[in-house]
């Protein structure tokens, strides 16, 4: 074999009869004990891209990934398999989801919508909160796709509820400043607290095809008597597939929103 060629190609992993669409864009990894494995992603629509780990072996100088049931040199991905042998045992754990912000640094599940600017936030771990600072939008602003200082985390499960308590202290000399809780994607929906000329207003808004520059639509709004509010989003995966979209796991997702002034009694708002 020569690094300069000639080159050959061969399909060594395909969806086959599984529900794992794709699969593609991955990397070969090996363990300290000599095992071979393959990492790849699966596009699951609103849930983002799931990471899969597949067993891998070498047959006649070609990698065979997943399970090769018919022994034709092309495997299918698996959902369940024995764990890699990494030389020692580790306890079962899951990525962090909740956060009381009791550290001076952001927990690793958080990510920004753009390259981080340290002026966007201040972590007050001693008192258990994070302070987020707002910045003016650009003249070309269309929707939140144009906003870099969104603090986000990946979808953690097919069904879950996210709740946050926030206190909004807008700059009094400006109107239009806002904050809130958003489920962000190609489309997005959320609860937004805005400083208006009539005081603080909580709105439930959506933006379809946000990635294409669409404008937000407000479904419902209420005036707030105080500046501390609890916001809740219930994320549910429905048992029906998005029409025309690829993948057995690309299912319709629904989000419902509610709010509370005391953290106990919640009222639905919007969709």
Task: Show the residue positions of the predicted features.
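Carbohydrate-active catalytic/glycan-binding domains of CAZyme proteins
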Residues: 1-271
């Amino acid at each position: 074999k020569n690094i300069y060629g000639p080159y050959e190609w061969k399909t060594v992993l395909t969806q086959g009869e599984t529900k794992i669409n794709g699969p593609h864009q991955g990397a070969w990894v090996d363990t300290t004990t000599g095992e071979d494995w393959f990492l790849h992603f699966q596009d699951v629509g609103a849930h983002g891209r799931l990471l899969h780990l597949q067993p891998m072996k070498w047959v006649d100088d070609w990698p065979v990934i997943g399970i090769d049931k018919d022994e034709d040199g092309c495997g299918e991905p698996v959902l369940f398999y024995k764990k890699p042998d990494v030389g020692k045992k580790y306890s079962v754990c899951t990525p962090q989801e909740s956060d009381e912000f009791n550290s001076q640094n952001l927990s690793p599940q958080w990510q920004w919508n753009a390259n981080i600017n340290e002026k966007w936030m201040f972590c007050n771990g001693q008192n258990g909160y994070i302070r987020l600072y707002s910045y003016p939008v650009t003249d070309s602003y269309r929707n939140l796709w144009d906003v870099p200082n969104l603090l986000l985390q990946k979808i953690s499960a097919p069904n879950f509820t996210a709740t946050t308590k926030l206190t909004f202290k807008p700059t009094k000399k400006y109107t239009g400043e806002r904050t809130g809780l958003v489920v962000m994607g190609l489309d997005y929906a959320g609860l937004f607290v805005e400083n208006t000329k009539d005081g603080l207003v909580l709105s439930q808004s959506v933006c379809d095809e946000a990635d294409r520059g669409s404008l937000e639509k407000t479904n419902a709004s209420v005036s707030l008597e105080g500046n501390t509010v609890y916001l809740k989003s219930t994320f549910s995966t429905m048992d029906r597939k998005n029409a025309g979209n690829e993948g057995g796991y690309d299912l319709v997702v629904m989000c419902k929103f509610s709010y509370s002034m005391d953290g106990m009694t919640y009222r639905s708002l919007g969709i």
